[in-house]
Each structure stands twice: as structure tokens, then as C-alpha cells.
């Protein structure tokens, strides 16, 4: 942001500076002083400015009132706020300032106590409360309200703009409006953080685990080419907590699209459902293949082999660093996106030979504890399904019929169960050797999902496969599709009023069946 020519510029002659984050403070203070700007400051900020050899007036010298109550009261004084809030366009305001002996401020530079960071550090409630800034937001909001007369800056990233503006005669009105908008965003995000902590942790209204207030703030990171379809404008926003897919580092390739982001998000979640090296290949938010292996190259080979036709133009997520061996294989297949925590030596060189593949680095595993789903007039909030239910542990499963599986066989069935979580309901997944071999997803009845999974697997791979169903079989017909294809074992939640009929069908076919008591609908 630079000052532009125009008669609505406000020269900067006097500045109030009070910052917690002192990044770039000395250079800012020197630059303002060299430009003839008078500096007024508080506490440690004033001390840092003075230590840099820059003349500064302490705010208590201005107010005639000492800083008190362990720093809780510093700037809450009429001689400070009148100087910020005076609308210099009005003769009456200018006259009152003269009568009161108050000089106006042209620039306010303030950033706030690190409340969010203090909470994240595990600090005690009293320590968190102490980091609730009072004077800072008051000055920021006052200056932002009075943007016709005052420029307000809340980020060190703007300091270079400040110095350019000072040299150029001040910020024009359009720039002051933009700075005011940033300032209100700054205080709004701060207030949401404080209110959310009170509602969720410090003073919850009940023990439901869901706060009575739900607030969130996002900043626009990028305007996307379009949304799901060309007639839908779209943009990417990031949360102040940072990290995650929205702030992944793009190492190569074309700009990410809306659909790229939705598929990549689904792929990362699917890959991180597994503790072993895992690769998930996703198309339209559904798996083309999920596999685990001794290493990521093996996992990718098995995941791709599940459905090579659908994997063409897919999105790949890996829960380990990508090896050169895997990268060379991926480079030979048309792939929209690959995302991983990192890339080993030689992997990026192999991938970047393909001009258009988007290569992302997202070091941390998906960690959102809750999911928010907007609906008309409101939103739904639920705890994220991380396969954390008791029934996700095979040790808790109930053998409904058939011979108990060996440890190795049970591990195969457990893989199928975990992989099935990533499939849109109604979901049936067939697996062999730690890899999906047939996926039936998104059908409105379980019979069609079973048919689709068997069809995708083919007769040879379906024979002896391990099958998982995200919800119970309401009738034996869906199960009979699987047993007719020769599956070895089935895992499902159970709980249908017709469980006896379903168990009888499995028993008749000589198929082992386990009940988990846990469902994994996914919409």
C-alpha cells in the first residue's frame, strides 16, 4: 500500500505507538523521527524506542497520570483518546482540542497482547485472562472509527507503507479506509478468540462440549479461478490458527482450484486414517484407491492398481515423505495434485518434470477437532470422525458368525474397515493385501454399493477379499452380493432389526462376519 496523490491526504506529524510485537519497531521509530514525526509511546515500547536513540514522549508525561495496576491502565485517558477521536474536519472538534490543551494524533500504531498464543501454550486461566488486552483494542477501534483524520496500523508488515506515506505527505483517504478495515478485522478476530475461549473453556454454559457461542474468523488468501463450476465465483480463506491444507506450501504446478482443494482435503484425511505408510488416491472426494505398504512406493502401486481408470487425473495424498521411487511412478501418470508432509531427495526433481502437477507440502496431519457444516439459516457442528470410537478397535469386535480370523487376517479386515471410513455413504469396500480392490460409494441403497464394489474388483480380486460396510445391512441382499462374489470375511456395525437374517445368510455362505457396534456414515 502506498500513498497516492490527492487533496485528501493527512500529513503525519504526531504518532502514538504501543505494540506487543516489536518486530521492526526500531526502524519504524527511526524513520518517523527522521521525517520529523513526534512519537508518543507506552511502557516497554517507549523503552525500546528510547534505547534505539530516538526521542520519545512517555504517555504518562502526556496524561500526567502514572501507569498503574501492573500495566492494566496506561492509555485509558481523555488526553489520549481525545487526540485519537477528534474529527479534524470539524471546527468544533479542533476548537475543543485547543481549549483542552490536547494535540491530535495523525497515526496510531498498535498491536495486541498475544491472547490466542497464550491459550495455545497451555497457560493457566489467570494467565490467559491477564493477556486480554483492553487499552490496545480501545485505541485501535478509536483510530479506525476516526479514519478521516487518523491512520491506524496493526501489523508490522505495514511499516514500510507508513514510512513511504510519511515521505509522500501522508495516507490518502482510500488508504486510511483500508487500514481502518484491517484494524477492525484485527480487533474482531481478537474478540472472537476471547469470547470463544470463555464459551468453550473458561465459562461453558453446560457440559455438552458444545459452546453456546460459535465464532470464527478467516482471512482471504486467494481468489480462485472459479468454484465447483465456472459460473460459481470462489475464494480460499485461511484461519488464524494456521497450518493445514489451506496454508500448505505449493512447490510446483498450476494454481490450485476449488475442486483441487476439496479433493486434496478428502485425500489427506483418508491417508492419515492409517498408521502405516499410506497412499490415498481421490476423485470427486471419493477414493479410487487406498493402500498401505512397507513404504510409500509400494502403497502407491497398490492404491493405483485398485482402479487405474479412475485414478487418471486424481489427487494423491501420502502420510509419509514421498520417495524418489514413488515420485518417478507418479510422474508417469496424469495426476492433478500430490500432497505429502515432505519429499525425499530426488522426489521433487522427478515430479517437477511434469509441468502441470500441483505439488504441495503440508507437514502436519489433519487435526481439526470439529467439523462445521453450513445449512440454510445456521450451521451444524460435530466432532470429527477420526476412527476414535470403541468399535474401531478390532479387539472389541463381536464375532457374529464363522471361524475367528487369524491375527493377519483380522489386520486385513481392520484395514478394510478403516479405509471404508473415507468412502461416501452408502459405502462398501473390498480389500486384499492392505489395499482396496473394489469400492462401492455414494449409492442410495447398500445393494447397489455392494454390486459396484464387486464389479470394480472383478471376479478374481473379489474372491477371498475382505469386505467392510460403513453401516449395517438392513436385509441379507447386500451381503449376498458379497458372499456370491466369494469374499472371505465381512465387517459391519450390526444393529439391524434383521441382523439374524443377515447372520444366517453369512453362515449359510460360510463367511466370517464381525460386528463393530460402530457406524461410519460419511456424506
UniProtKB/Swiss-Prot annotation:
InterPro entries: AICAR_Tfase_dup_dom_sf (IPR024051), Cytidine_deaminase-like (IPR016193), MGS-like_dom (IPR011607), MGS-like_dom_sf (IPR036914), PurH-like (IPR002695)
Pfam families registered for this protein in UniProt: AICARFT_IMPCHas (PF01808), MGS (PF02142)
SUPFAM superfamilies given in the database record: Cytidine deaminase-like, Methylglyoxal synthase-like
GO BP annotation list: 'de novo' IMP biosynthetic process
Entries under SMART domains matching the protein: AICARFT_IMPCHas (SM00798), MGS (SM00851)
Keywords: Hydrolase, Multifunctional enzyme, Purine biosynthesis, Transferase
Protein name as it appears in the record: Bifunctional purine biosynthesis protein PurH
Taxonomic lineage from the root: Bacteria, Bacillati, Actinomycetota, Actinomycetes, Kitasatosporales
Amino acid at each position: 500500500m502506498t500513498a497516492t496523490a490527492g487533496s485528501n491526504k493527512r500529513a503525519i506529524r504526531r504518532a502514538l505507538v504501543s505494540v506487543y510485537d516489536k518486530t521492526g519497531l526500531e526502524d519504524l521509530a527511526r524513520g518517523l523521527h527522521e521525517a520529523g514525526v513526534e512519537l508518543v509511546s507506552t511502557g516497554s515500547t517507549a523503552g525500546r524506542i528510547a534505547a534505539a536513540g530516538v526521542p520519545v514522549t512517555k504517555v504518562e508525561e502526556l496524561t500526567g497520570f502514572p501507569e498503574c495496576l501492573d500495566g492494566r491502565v496506561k492509555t485509558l485517558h481523555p488526553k489520549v483518546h481525545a487526540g485519537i477521536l477528534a474529527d479534524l474536519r470539524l471546527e468544533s472538534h479542533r476548537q475543543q482540542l485547543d481549549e483542552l490543551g490536547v494535540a491530535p494524533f495523525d497515526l496510531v500504531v498498535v498491536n495486541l497482547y498475544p491472547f490466542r498464543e497464550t491459550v495455545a501454550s497451555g497457560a493457566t486461566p489467570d494467565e490467559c485472562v491477564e493477556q486480554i488486552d483492553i487499552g490496545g483494542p480501545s485505541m485501535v477501534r478509536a483510530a479506525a472509527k476516526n479514519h478521516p483524520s487518523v491512520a491506524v496500523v496493526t501489523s508490522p508488515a505495514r511499516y514500510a507503507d507508513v514510512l513511504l506515506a510519511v515521505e509522500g505527505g501522508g495516507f490518502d483517504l482510500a488508504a486510511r479506509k483500508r487500514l481502518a478495515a484491517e484494524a477492525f478485522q484485527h480487533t474482531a478476530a481478537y474478540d472472537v478468540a476471547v469470547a470463544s475461549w470463555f464459551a468453550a473453556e473458561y465459562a461453558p454454559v453446560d457440559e455438552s462440549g458444545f459452546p453456546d457461542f460459535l465464532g470464527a474468523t478467516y482471512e482471504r488468501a486467494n481468489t480462485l479461478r472459479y468454484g465447483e463450476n465456472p459460473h460459481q465465483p470462489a475464494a480460499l480463506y485461511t484461519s488464524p490458527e494456521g497450518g493445514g491444507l489451506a496454508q500448505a506450501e505449493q512447490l510446483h504446478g498450476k494454481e490450485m482450484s476449488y475442486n483441487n482443494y476439496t479433493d486434496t482435503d478428502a485425500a489427506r484425511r483418508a491417508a492419515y486414517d492409517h498408521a502405516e505408510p499410506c497412499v490415498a488416491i481421490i476423485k470427486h472426494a471419493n477414493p479410487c484407491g487406498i493402500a498401505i505398504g512397507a513404504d510409500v512406493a509400494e502403497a502407491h502401486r497398490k492404491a493405483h492398481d485398485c482402479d487405474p481408470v479412475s485414478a487418471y487425473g486424481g489427487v494423491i495424498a501420502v502420510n509419509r515423505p514421498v520417495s524418489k521411487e514413488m515420485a518417478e511412478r507418479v510422474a508417469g501418470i496424469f495426476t492433478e495434485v500430490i500432497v505429502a508432509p515432505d519429499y525425499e531427495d530426488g522426489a521433487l526433481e522427478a515430479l517437477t518434470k511434469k509441468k502441470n502437477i500441483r505439488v504441495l507440502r503440508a507437514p502436519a496431519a489433519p487435526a481439526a477437532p470439529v467439523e462445521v457444516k453450513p445449512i440454510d439459516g445456521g450451521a451444524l457442528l460435530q466432532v470429527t470422525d477420526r476412527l476414535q470410537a470403541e468399535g474401531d478397535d478390532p479387539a472389541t469386535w463381536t464375532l457374529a458368525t464363522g471361524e475367528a480370523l487369524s491375527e493377519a487376517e483380522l489386520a486385513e479386515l481392520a484395514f478394510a474397515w478403516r479405509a471404508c471410513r473415507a468412502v461416501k455413504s452408502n459405502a462398501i469396500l473390498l480389500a486384499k493385501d492392505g489395499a482396496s480392490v473394489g469400492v462401492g460409494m455414494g449409492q442410495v441403497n447398500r445393494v447397489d454399493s455392494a454390486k459396484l464394489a464387486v464389479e470394480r474388483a472383478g471376479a478374481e480380486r473379489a474372491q477371498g477379499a475382505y469386505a467392510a460396510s460403513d453401516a449395517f445391512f438392513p436385509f441379507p441382499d447386500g451381503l449376498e452380493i458379497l458372499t456370491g462374489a466369494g469374499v472371505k470375511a465381512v465387517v459391519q456395525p450390526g444393529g439391524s432389526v434383521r441382523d439374524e437374517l443377515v447372520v444366517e445368510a453369512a453362515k449359510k455362505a460360510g463367511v466370517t462376519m464381525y460386528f463393530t457396534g460402530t457406524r461410519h456414515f460419511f456424506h
